[in-house]
Amino acid sequence: MARAGHAYPQVDARARGLMDGRVVSLARSLSVSRALEAMRGAKARSALASPSTAALRSDLERAASWQLGHLRWMDLAYPRLPVLEARAGEIVVRRQLDGGAPLVLIREGGRLVGMVEASAISRPAPSLAARLDRLHGPSAESKLWVLRMVGKLGEDQGQAVFVVGGFVRDLLLGAGTFMPDLDLVVEGDGVAFGRRLAEETGGHLVVHAAFGTASLEGGLTPDGTPLGRVDIASARGERYGLPGALPEVTPASMEEDLGRRDFSVNAMAVALSPSAWGRLHDPHGGERDVGERRLRVLHPLSLAEDPTRIFRAARYVARLGLRPDQGFHRALALALRLGAYPAMSGQRLVGEIELIMEEPDPWRVLALLLRWGAFRLWDAAYRSTRTSLSRLSKARALTRWARGAGVGLDATELALLALLFDQAKPVADRCLRRLAVRDPAARLLDAAPARQLARRLDRAPRMRPSQVAEAVRPTASPVVLGAWLCGGPRARRRIEWFLAAGRGARPLSSGDDVMAAGVPRGPLVAQALCVLRDLKLDGRVRTLEDEHVALDRWTRALTMKGDLR
């Protein structure tokens, strides 16, 4: 174990004394399985491919547990690691680890003799109490109230309670980025603690027993301010049986709980008990990464462990201005290479698109994912092209227009259209099956009918409004949106007119008015109302009296033809 040198500031421990594992040099071509055999035989915690490239045994063991022993161990290696002499002081080691290195290699007598892993070095726990106390505004004050209350409640029950994840990250970023929900972790029974919290706040608790978690909704502060959603969980470890599968959970400490998380910026916790109020737990250097706006995974298989983290990462990059580091991009390339993740349901993938569409700029998020090649998770043959990016840009313009015109659109449907429109039909069909989008929705997302409608609207130089409505009205919403995405300016203008005005047009006359004019109950009533509606669209009738005159003319014509008796 690493020596807790920080507890004795008068001692300048050397790098050799801080080493927490041996290293062994291996050929780059070895598989994970063969590398593990060699490491176990040498009782080494790290494998070396060069003086500055190494992989951790724990990462190789994780890969082997997923039947990925055939991978090259180098796929899980960290390149360009710092190398220090064994006589280097602890301060030098800490400086390298604080700079973002996952481990430091130690050299003595011209050869590498060991390593110091970042998570093995104790760090001082700074206090964020002053930041918490400066929170202001109704929403922030209600958060502060519940944080103090749960800390006191936990301390009275002998349980440590922490706020974790996004709240801590956003607290460090600045109040302007605050999200509405709170995530609490209890070292103990989180569900039982949630029930007590529901009693205190009058909220409704939804329990997810399989994961030891609960969600509180509808809670109020003593002055009646809504608390928003509060998620409560037991501190837990997770084991992924397969890449992309939902994890198996086991009780764990707070430190272990933080180690299972996606990114370092989310792997922080703030203690809430009165005796430790505001103390930051940051074993993975998240505070430093927040300060440098860096997005860093906790291990090379993080994105393969849970590929939905790729979509989450794009949201953080777009909304928070975080920059993925090289380790993220290596983990991304590995995750996309590993395959289709059959253990991950299509509903989870669609759920990620739905979450993206709630972001301030969802189209930027989707464009990032396109550039990263992330939609190969839907199908290995998915291709990201300039045309795909152009469709996203047009979709953004359509949503901007719809917002201004007060027209409601299905954002997820539009996103799927924009992302699949230019894929080969077999690829698009496989993507829809992967996403569990079934008929008839899958048929409606076919690009061919949309292209036909766009051509019809683009090519006709003159169309009466009623003719435009006749062309568009029978068409399902995905086809109309697809026609807007692929059509020219004329088609887009006509579709916008229909969505904003033509779709909702109704005659002033009712069915009773039509029957009073002598039209018998039945299909002819609906036909008469359609005629009046089209006349109204074309500006040929404006008042109820105009409609009565037109209806009288129409019924006489039917009578003369013998269609109305």
Residue spans for each PLM region:
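Catalytic cores of the polymerase beta-like nucleotidyltransferase superfamily
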Residues: 1-45, 58-565
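Acidic Ca2+-chelating loop motifs
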Residues: 53-55
